[in-house]
Amino acid sequence: MQPPPMRERQRWRPEEDAILLAYVRQYGPREWSLVSQRMNRPLHRDAKSCLERWKNYLRPGIKKGSLTDDEQRLVIRLQAKHGNKWKKIAAEVPGRTAKRLGKWWEVFKEKQQRELRDRDRRRLPPPLDGDERGCAGGRYDWLLEDFADKLVNDHHRRMMAAPILPPWMSSSPSSSSSPSVTLSLASAAVAPAPAAPPPTWGGGGGGEVVVAELMECCREMEEGQRAWAAHRKEAAWRMKRVEMQLETERACRRREATEEFEAKMRALREEQAAAVERVEAEYREKMAGLRRDAEAKEQKMAEQWAAKHARLAKFLDQVAACRRWPPVEINGGGGGGPGGGR
């Protein structure tokens, strides 16, 4: 008999589930390749699909629907303990399969990451407009311009505070005065000292180096902020996991304490019932012993009374036998009397 062609991967229909359930009720959960042959109804599914359908959806005892809060906390705690070993985790979560728990964990992790991304997006400052960002076009160009302005102003203030003096004014006070000094003061043909060239920011080579260093610092700051944001997001996610694990452990400990208390109460009740049963058994045994003793005493007294009655009857019989006259003597006495002599 040729096996039926396999159906393409699609959802199971209710009639296919009914065929599979009827087969399991009749033949048990084994030999899945013989479902169509034994049930005389075409089931276009291979043995592996039938096994997975039975094990993950149709097997008795499997819970359907969303996980409860206690189950979610338990799965989070077990995942932190065992990792992604879902078969091992499913063994400790009754009514849930490894496939179901793995799918729930993927959805839960994606949801947590999406919430963290949304939260970080709300916390980041809004980007600046094009006219506010300057010529560089970066996020921190306004900071670069501020740094450049501060450097230019500081340099200008230092230059104004320390002006360049001519050589004849910067001479030491210990030098002796000479007529050349008076002549140099009165002479108008003395050439003035050359003025210091103003600093060129942005046009000279030194300004370009400073701007490049500032740009590099800004890039490093931006990379540092990205790394810090990623670390912060990871830390927030781990913190939330730790909080959920702590809550799960707290609930588990509370449940374990409740179960332990109930177990102790059951043990006390059982011990009390056993003690009552022992007392009742001892009472019944003592009552039975007293009843047996009473019956034995009564029987003994009855036997004694019967023996006394027998001895008394025997004694009476003996007394009666001793007082009875023999009939020969009575007749002889009558013949020897006066009437007999006649």
UniProtKB/Swiss-Prot annotation:
Keyword Mitochondrion recorded: no
GO molecular function, one term: protein homodimerization activity
One GO cellular component, as annotated: nucleolus
One record GO biological process: defense response to fungus
DNA-binding region ranges: 32-58, 86-109
Domain of life of the source: Eukaryota
InterPro entries per UniProt: Homeodomain-like_sf, Leaf_Dev_Regulator, Myb_dom, SANT/Myb
Pfam families linked: Myb_DNA-binding
Domain HTH myb-type: 1-58, 59-113
Coiled coil: 253-304
Subcellular localization: Nucleus
Keywords attached to this entry: Coiled coil, DNA-binding, Nucleus, Repeat, Transcription, Transcription regulation
Principal cellular location given in the protein's record: nucleus
Function per UniProt: Transcription factor required for normal cell differentiation. May interact with other proteins to repress the knox homeobox genes.
This protein's name: Protein rough sheath 2 homolog
Species: Oryza sativa subsp. japonica (Rice)
Source species taxonomy: Eukaryota, Viridiplantae, Streptophyta, Embryophyta, Tracheophyta
